[in-house]
Amino acid sequence: MKRTLLALTLVTAFFGSHAAFADTNSTRDPYITEADVSAVHGVNWDNYVQAETDWNFRQVTDKVGVNQWIHDAPVSKDNQTVIRSNRDVVYSIAVVDVSKGATFSVTDKNNDEFQIIHIIDENHLTHKVVRRGESVTITPDDLSGGNYVYLLARTKDNGNLADTQRRQKLLSFTANSAKPYPAKGFTEQDVVDYRLKLINNVMTGKVTVEGVKGFGQTLNDVVDKDYRYAAAYGWGGLMPTTAQYLEAVPGQGAPECQEWRIPQPKLNRELGGYWSVTTYGPDGWIAKDKFYIAGENTKDNGDGTSSVFFNCGGELAKYSLDVMKNWAAIVRFYEPSDVQETLDYLQTLRGISVKPVQ
């Protein structure tokens, strides 16, 4: 099985050149006296986001250079390169030189499923989303800094491998320059170690982070602390206007036949909005072959609710996922109709637990 614990786009349910360095000399929050944010050699609190972003850029440019797509294969139990991998989309990634302008397009011809190009600048800002039927031109003036952008395109995996791969190839861009990306000189291990330091602060309860406040177009749109932790815990995550995540299914973990019955979400179907449930083993890796279900394949109860089942057979098997003891899940919602309404909806879901099927 192909596994890399810390690989491209550590996007979990967190929720979320010298010219590229943002002005990060902001007043620090009092929490830093409690959490360990001390420097790891050349990587520190002030430059970490740029170092992390540079690390992600280099994972692409070291393989294919600039202005070249890498189309990932769909996730499965035997093909998962990132912990808590996302099954409902396939990724296409690239680093593009926009120093003289570049245009990014997602066609809507022969393309009726969710698909976006997510554009990220060298400060892990901008977060521009290009949707089906749209073309967007980006120059350095549109960024918070730098001359290069990272593309993290997402194409809905509809279960038809050939069609999914066909739609990936519909993604396009044209760039007017192709200068090699100039790495910023950070040592890879220092970046990884500092990332783990910040993640450990969250996991041990030394700091609380609001992922939705860590992603924005400019520094004025983010909270300083959340911005830095978001880069560690969810680099490449989408802003809540495009996707929102439920970090766990309440009551998860037991291996008996159970049902999770929830109100159906309000998503923008015209933009291809949909939702899904993906399950994992206790170590965060996909553990079973039947680990994922799209919202449209859950059981419609006819009363405005849908049900997902776990380890159930018989007539419920087609709505059921296979799980092991101490399993966990992430629920993903794409293209919410209303951002705040969906945030409130997620809070409601946190109070709805799975129940044994009698």
Mark where each language-model region is.
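A compositional/structural signature for long, glycine/proline-rich flexible linkers
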Residues: 22-358
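Gram-negative bacterial Sec-dependent N-terminal signal peptides
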Residues: 1-22
